[in-house]
Amino acid sequence: MVTTQKIAGAIVGAAMLAFGQGALAQQAYPAKSVQVIVPWTPGQATDAAARTAADKLSAAMGQSFIVENKAGAGGTIGASYVARAKADGYTLLAGSTGSITTGPLLNGAPYSAKDFAPVSLIATVPYVLVTRSDFPAQSAQELVETLVKNPDKYTFASSGVGSIGHLTAELFTNRLGIKATHIPYNGSAKALTDVMSGEVTFMFDSPTSIASHVQSGKVRAYAVSSKNRSQTLPDVPTIAETT
């Protein structure tokens, strides 16, 4: 099962490919503000991690690390922007598994993982299975039973083709032997809105994105994909606990 999304925020840059030890030895880095591109909409897990990292880096390095969102096409628009950027260390990508690796494979993006140089991993993010709050199934087991009984009836949302939420849902439905229809969005905010309204049946999203909606009773969270429970949603069981 795809359990987590790895985030290399403020961390991966085409810029770093040509920014070797010689250049670093000749000048202090950073000598000016650094642009950090997040290839997703504001409020998602990658965005939150990137902003936290940018704040820490700004304080530690004496220059501003400025986060800018360039969302769309499963994260490949922002990643393409960084891949084309000048290789001087001042344009970084708050990358994730979806934007760096699966995006080029599924979306035909004009770059590959080899076009980026990893600097550090800053977070791993589990995904939570959610539906609208009044969906009839009261537990993960009941949800599975409902989906299996009507294998062609339901839909699932994601933040874009090739995103980890998309791939997690595909694996989930594949293992259940059902053919739920994928509805991709430009970011998870609109996707989650349509899940809450019942226009789309379910989705896998990060705890950061859904926590306030779970707590306010707008969505029902069934299970988290990680080995251990999420600190953000400690009352939501793991998938292993529900099977």
Residue ranges and their predicted role:
Residues 57, 84-90, 104-190, 239-241:
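Hinge/capping helix and adjacent helix->loop/strand transition within the periplasmic-binding protein
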Residues 94-99, 103-104, 188, 205-210, ...:
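Beta->alpha turn/N-cap motifs
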